[in-house]
């Protein structure tokens, strides 16, 4: 779908004009490193490189399998989030679980995950094409090295789990601290299986077997959903850290059950890899393998990952300290990392569903244009890609702003999460969604640099952006009452992307001889204006249906009426404002529906 829309835009609109005073650059000698198009960022589930390959055989069938798998993964992930909130809530136990659950992924990304995504996967694809044995020896060495490294890292992480909690949650104390340490020891066992899953997925993608990597997370989600429901049926709602210490079997169920989901996911992927013909034969003869040279080329990407992990460390510390302080003051609504994470998961959904698809379609196009010395076409791709993403992300972000609180009450206010807790999540989400456009712009700009073969610039840009994020985040902790800190914590988070996007815009403006800024800004303004009548209708519907009984029916009725009516108003207003991106998208959608 994104490829079709991009092609339609390319046919229907003129090429982007260079900014005033600049000439179009078409230098055949300006060749980038096409291989860097496969270097993925840090977003969850964002495996950009995988879909850039053309699968043999029935491409339509393969694409359909991947699309359905992706949708099922998102849907089951959404359900998992809802069930998890019902099981652990947003109070002290929820904060303990969230911090402990973040530790294995942070450790993995910092020590191995970044290298795997940015270096070893492109290196493996290259060796499979060039080596006489089809890259078999390289794969055997890589698997052996990775599994040994993962085993050692997992073992050490279990031993030092307490230090991870001290680092990431310095504000925890008493039973909350003890529960966090126990959960961390259970959950860091996932590190080995997270790495095995990532490696198996990469090797399957290199073999053009895309189905299993798309479907395996569904199994993980289903296991965790089952574990959370089981935990809720045994422990009941409103469990506290003290309750968990008194019932260690319930704590073991929560921790080991979560880890089991990752184990099952890894097992599915390893089985799929074996079915594809891979047989592991341990090899440690690394001399001459090229792995060291490949890893050495990742220095700038690793710098970016280190800065990103530093940002996660700052946000986690601020949120956990604020949540613990608010609880000490007797504040009953969740004000820590759990509420922040539940809002963040919803915030990233539009980007994960819409913008990631556009990025996947853009990367090979931009890389081809770089290789052909057509930076003017790279500029056109970026402009069209951002405007295409904005056509859906702008109205969705405004809808999320309007319906954030009733929607969060509808999905989260059950089990261990009270209506007041859910309302707090909704208010955090309202602050988050204001940052959705800068977040999307930053991610697209970063992929332009990767298509240009430049990992250095995004890494360097991340440093001042992270300084701004850390400074403002700690300022919130110092100056605000603890129960309000997490509400405004998305502002420092968004500031990182605002500053990063501004800096990268200026740098890309020079690299690409303009960025079609006037047209892009005009489209953004028109799109936001087109959402005003829809937003007013949405707010009106919230007030109209407020009198219905319960928490679910008022929210559901307001969202159905306001969403349907708002969508119609948005399209009509966009037509009046002559937003051609919206009309082109709708025409393409009509054409595809007629074909079916």
Identify the function of each model-found stretch.
Residues 1-596:
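Membrane-embedded alpha-helical bundles of multi-pass transporters/translocases
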């Amino acid at each position: 779908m994104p490829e079709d829309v991009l092609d339609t835009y390319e046919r229907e609109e003129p090429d982007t004009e260079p900014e005033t005073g600049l000439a179009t650059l078409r230098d055949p000698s300006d060749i980038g490193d096409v291989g860097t198009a496969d270097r993925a960022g840090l977003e969850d589930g964002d495996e950009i490189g995988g879909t850039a390959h053309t699968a043999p055989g029935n491409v339509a069938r393969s694409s359909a399998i991947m699309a359905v798998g992706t949708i099922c993964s998102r849907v089951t992930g959404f359900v998992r989030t809802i069930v998890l909130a019902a099981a652990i809530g947003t109070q002290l136990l929820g904060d303990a679980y969230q911090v402990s659950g973040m530790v294995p992924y942070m450790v993995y990304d910092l020590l191995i995950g970044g290298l795997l995504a940015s270096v070893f996967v492109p290196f493996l694809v290259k060796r499979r094409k060039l080596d006489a044995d089809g890259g078999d020896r390289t794969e055997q060495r890589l698997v052996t090295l990775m599994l040994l490294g993962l085993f050692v890292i997992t073992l050490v992480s279990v031993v030092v789990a307490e230090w991870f909690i001290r680092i990431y949650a310095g504000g925890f104390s008493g039973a909350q601290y003890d529960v966090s340490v126990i959960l961390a020891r259970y959950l860091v066992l996932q590190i080995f299986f997270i790495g095995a899953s990532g490696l198996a997925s990469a090797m399957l993608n290199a073999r053009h077997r895309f189905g299993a990597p798309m479907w395996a997370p569904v199994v993980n989600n289903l296991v965790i959903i089952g574990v959370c429901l089981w935990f809720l049926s045994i422990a009941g709602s409103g469990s506290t850290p003290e309750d968990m210490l008194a019932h260690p079997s319930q704590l073991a169920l929560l921790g080991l059950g979560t880890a089991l989901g990752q184990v099952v996911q890894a097992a599915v992927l390893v089985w799929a890899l074996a079915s594809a013909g891979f047989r592991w034969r341990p090899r440690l003869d690394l001399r001459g393998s090229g792995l060291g040279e490949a890893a050495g080329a990742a220095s700038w990407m690793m710098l970016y990952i280190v800065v990103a992990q530093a940002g996660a460390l700052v946000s986690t510390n601020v949120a956990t300290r604020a949540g613990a302080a608010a609880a000490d003051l007797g504040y009953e609504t969740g004000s820590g990392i759990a509420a922040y994470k539940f809002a963040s998961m919803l915030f990233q959904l539009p980007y994960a569903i819409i913008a990631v698809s556009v990025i996947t379609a853009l990367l090979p196009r931009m890389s081809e244009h770089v290789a052909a010395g057509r930076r003017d076409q790279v500029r056109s791709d970026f402009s069209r890609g951002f405007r295409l993403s904005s056509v859906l992300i702008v109205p969705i972000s405004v809808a999320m702003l309007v319906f954030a609180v009733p929607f969060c009450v509808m999905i989260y206010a059950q089990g261990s999460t009270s209506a007041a807790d859910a309302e707090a999540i909704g208010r955090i989400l309202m602050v988050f969604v204001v940052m959705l456009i800068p977040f999307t712009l930053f991610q697209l700009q970063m992929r332009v640099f990767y298509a240009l073969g430049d990992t250095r610039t995004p890494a360097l840009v991340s440093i001042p952006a992270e300084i701004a994020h850390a400074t403002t985040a700690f300022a919130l902790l110092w100056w605000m009452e603890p129960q309000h800190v997490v509400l405004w914590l998305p502002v420092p988070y968004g500031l990182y992307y605002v500053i990063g996007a501004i800096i990268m815009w200026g740098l890309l403006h020079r690299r690409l001889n303009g960025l079609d800024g006037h047209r892009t800004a005009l489209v953004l303004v028109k799109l936001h204006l087109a959402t005003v009548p829809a937003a007013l209708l949405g707010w009106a519907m919230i007030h109209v249906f407020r009198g219905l009984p319960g928490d679910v029916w008022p929210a559901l009725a307001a969202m159905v009426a306001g969403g349907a009516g708002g969508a119609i108003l948005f399209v009509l207003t966009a037509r009046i404002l002559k937003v051609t991106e919206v009309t082109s998208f709708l025409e393409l959608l009509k054409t595809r529906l007629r074909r079916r």
